[in-house]
């Protein structure tokens, strides 16, 4: 009835469900936006990460998360010579002796994996706007002594 009232076609409505396992003993968690939030039409992924299980999206008062912008080469690959990682802020929750939430190799791996996902979403959805302005919003976890990266969920980013 509500859809009919607002003129929404029943056949145009989609619904999904996301199920994943619980992640015990998270070493880190974070969010990636696959577009440059600070310079439209420029390359760059914005990564916000936090040590442990503390929320990145709604952190407790006085908690700062690590924020990184990853710039990549013309192929959107972190494997080229022109990759740059720029730290905008560091977590204030790091234990002594730890300099950052994410290691460089984790940033490279995360960026490599997410670049592939972004290209597939962009092509499959038939997006007409510029590739660099198309964003996905991804959540990730780093778990275990070997620091395995899990992509928890992916959805289109809404400005």
Regions found by a protein language model. Give the residues of each.
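Conserved mixed alpha/beta core segments that line enzyme active sites in large multi-domain catalysts
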Residues: 1-159
């Amino acid at each position: 009835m509500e859809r009919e009232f607002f003129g929404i076609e029943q056949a145009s409505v989609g619904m999904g469900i996301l199920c994943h396992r619980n992640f015990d003993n998270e070493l880190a968690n974070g969010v990636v936006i696959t577009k440059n939030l600070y310079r439209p039409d420029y390359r760059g992924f914005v990564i916000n990460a936090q040590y442990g299980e503390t929320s990145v999206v709604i952190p407790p008062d006085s908690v700062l998360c690590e924020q990184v912008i990853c710039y990549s080469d013309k192929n959107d690959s972190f494997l080229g010579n022109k990759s740059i990682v720029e730290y905008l802020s560091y977590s204030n929750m790091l234990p002594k002796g730890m300099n950052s939430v994410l290691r460089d190799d984790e940033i490279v791996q995360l960026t490599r994996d997410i670049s592939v996902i972004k290209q597939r979403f962009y092509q499959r959805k038939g997006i007409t706007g510029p590739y660099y302005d198309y964003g996905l919003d991804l959540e990730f976890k780093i778990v275990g002594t070997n620091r395995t990266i899990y992509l928890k969920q992916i959805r289109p980013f809404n400005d």
